[in-house]
Amino acid sequence: MKRILLAFGLVTLAAISAACSSAAAPPGASGPVDPSGPTIVAKDMKFAGGPVEVKAGTNFTLHFDNQDSAPHNVAVYTDSSASSAVSIGEVVTSGKKDQVVAALKPGTYFFRCDVHHDMTGTIVAK
């Protein structure tokens, strides 16, 4: 009985560890994820900095740092019409949140806060 409980505990621990891993590829993507992706900062109701550059063809981790007390997210779209989403991050009231973005083809992409549509930026995949 002790062996069964020990085995069950180990399987449960392994499942929890796998579920919490930030290196998993997003749905519809395969391959490794670059954990050293860009950081996007929300401060004073805008995104800080200029265009964000990423390596084309590689899944990457987008590090979001919400320094406002207002809720924000980072939603990546193919263009400024925001009609075709590439990755939609979780809304964060304050603090940091990582999201994995599937590999982008070379080109320019649009991102915004889906809560505050006037908060926008550009991602360039090279």
Where are these regions (language model features)?
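Extracytoplasmic copper-binding redox domains, predominantly the cupredoxin/blue-copper superfamily
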Residues: 2-9, 13-16, 20-126
